[in-house]
Amino acid sequence: MNQDTICALATADGVGAIGIIRVSGQDALAVVNRIFEGKNLEKVPTHTVHYGFIKDQEEIIDEVMVSVFHAPRTFTAENSVEISFHGSPHIAKKILEALLKNGARTAKAGEFTMRAFMNGRIDLSQAESIADLIASENEASRKAALEQLKGGISKEIAVLRGDLLNFTSLIELELDFAEEDVEFADRSALMGLIANLKTKLGSLIDSFQYGNAVKNGINVAIIGKPNAGKSTLLNALLKEERAIVSDIAGTTRDTIEEVLHIKGTAFRFIDTAGIRETSDTIEEIGVKKAKEKIASAKVLLYLYDEQDSGVEEIISFIKEFYRPDLKVMLLHNKIDQNKGVSAENISEIDQALKRELVPDYTDTILGISARENINIELLKAELSSFVETLKGSENAVVITNQRHYEALRKSLDSVERVEEAVVSGIHTELLAYELRTALEHLGEISGEFTNDEVLENIFSKFCIGK
């Protein structure tokens, strides 16, 4: 690990009441002391704050408060200093220049957090959670990132690795005594361990569906024929005139995307062009983009009304785009204009759709009026309930990181191959190889098994001061 003393602005760029510059490294106290007029920072106790001035030679740059932290009780586990100054970008630039002149260098993106990881202060999953916490935009993503930072995933992985390691050691011991044909690892006990691992790994893998939704939001595609009321629905959900509304079919030519937070979860609503056969080149491009958005959606809101082409066309459309992981909600729009239709979905078209589509393709048919805001809050409640169905038990660990998800999948694959090998009575050497592989994939999550390229990719996504 590089022992250079590094420095960077820790607060956001721009003017503010207070700015903070972080300094970390073996010589951090000495470097800052060279430009600080006040107490001798190399002699003050750890976790103390001191008033004084930052100087560049004889020129006073600013009046500051300096916080001193001695290794190893710091974020990076190195000597660290934080300089709080009046939040002018010009002052920040001058202080950083003074630090560079006196032995520090500019930190790379994520280098403070990388040092915390390399010095054993946090593991790799906790390091990634810091970036997630900074990027969190809603309550659900904040809580998930904080739980990961507190070590929720780390503890779960440590237990799994501990169980695997015990058996791997016994299997490898058998290899050492291969000529004596001794069996150290009880195969029935190994099968019990495998069953337990499969359950735990499967639970973590399944949690990614909810975790990914929490972290990145849920894509909701609003679809239907031209003039079905899709743009009106988007405006009703957002409570603002975001999309152009017109009686002319085909008004929306491109997709419009807006994020709405419902009970702490971000829903990304996508108003698509009405899907129909058309000779209009621009509208045709819009229809193509709409179909692409449907492919990436987690929820499909299909709008129709009594003037629609009928049940068969709606059913055909839903079946064309349906996927097992897609939540489909049929919204019978404009119920304010049709006396025979109610919020209880008693119309003939609704009953036919229920017979044909429920429960194989959808479990929700709801009567609404986007124009009159009828049942819009009920629609939001349905969306929120859908998120709850993705959630496991209240205290279960949730996977939010794609890298962790892929490592868990690979580990489960290896565990399943171990199971096959035990059942088939395959040679101990293959068992040992697959057990080691499963261990390594779990170790990728915590950072025990990784490489410089992976680390560089992870930490390069951080901001400079973190």
Region spans (language model):
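A glycine-rich (often HGG/GG-containing) alpha/beta subdomain
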Residues: M1-K143, E147, G151, Y322, ...
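C-terminal-of-GTPase-core extension/linker across diverse P-loop GTPases
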Residues: N2-L9, D13, G52, R142-H261, ...
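Switch I (G2) and immediately adjacent beta-strands of P-loop GTPase domains
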Residues: Y51-H70, G250-T278, S296
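Short, Asp-centered acidic motifs that coordinate Mg2+ and/or phosphate
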Residues: F267, V299, M329
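Generic enzyme active-site microenvironment
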Residues: F269, L303, L331
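Inter-motif core of Ras-like GTPase G domains
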Residues: E283-Q307
